[in-house]
Every structure is written in structure tokens, then in C-alpha cells.
């Protein structure tokens, strides 16, 4: 059971929900440059499993690493942290 707790957990924004049971999540992180000490922003997109198609474009979601679900999917949704407001 402790293995499940060691899996990576990220918080990111849904940038695509066009696929069935799959969303694309953009995760932004900061790293410090070794020589200059400046914080540099990095971003990466993850394909994420969404069983109920509950996440929508613009939502902030928490995702967790899981077993490979397809050729590109390695994450699943844990919770929707904040729902987007469509104007």
C-alpha cells in the first residue's frame, strides 16, 4: 500500500478535453538555475485518464501517476480542485 503513496502527484490546468475518457493537463513547475540562482518556469503536458468525463476545459485538477493505461497515458484524476467559469 505504501507504493501507491510514493507515486507522483501534480496539480495542473486542463487544456484539452476533446478525447473520450482522456484529458490533457498542463503542469507548470519552477526550477532554480544552478549558476545564477534564478527561478525558471517549465511546463509539461500529461495525458490523463478521466473515467467519467467530469473534467472540463480550464479546470484545475490534481493528477496522480498510475500504471500505463495506453501508449501515452500514465496519470489519472484524483480530484477536481477548481472548476472553470465559462463566461
UniProtKB/Swiss-Prot annotation:
What CDD domains does this protein's entry cite? Ribosomal_uS17
One CC-aspect GO term: cytosolic small ribosomal subunit
Task: Name the cystine pairs.
Answer: none
Which UniProt keyword terms apply here? Answer: Ribonucleoprotein, Ribosomal protein, RNA-binding, rRNA-binding
What top-level branch of life does the organism fall under? Answer: Bacteria
Q: Return the InterPro entries for the record.
A: NA-bd_OB-fold, Ribosomal_uS17, Ribosomal_uS17_bact/chlr, Ribosomal_uS17_CS
Keyword Nucleus present in the record's keywords: the answer is no
Q: Name one GO biological process term.
A: translation
The UniProt subunit note reads as follows:
Part of the 30S ribosomal subunit.
Write the protein's name: Small ribosomal subunit protein uS17
In its UniProt entry, the species of origin is given as Staphylococcus aureus (strain Mu3 / ATCC 700698)
What's the gene? rpsQ
Amino acid at each position: 500500500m505504501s507504493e501507491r503513496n510514493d507515486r507522483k502527484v501534480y496539480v495542473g490546468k486542463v487544456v484539452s478535453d476533446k478525447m473520450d475518457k482522456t484529458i490533457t493537463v498542463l503542469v507548470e513547475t519552477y526550477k532554480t538555475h544552478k549558476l545564477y540562482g534564478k527561478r525558471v518556469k517549465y511546463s509539461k503536458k500529461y495525458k490523463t485518464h478521466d473515467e467519467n468525463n467530469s473534467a472540463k476545459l480550464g479546470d484545475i485538477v490534481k493528477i496522480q501517476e498510475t500504471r500505463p493505461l495506453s501508449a501515452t497515458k500514465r496519470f489519472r484524476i484524483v480530484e477536481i480542485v477548481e472548476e472553470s467559469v465559462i463566461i
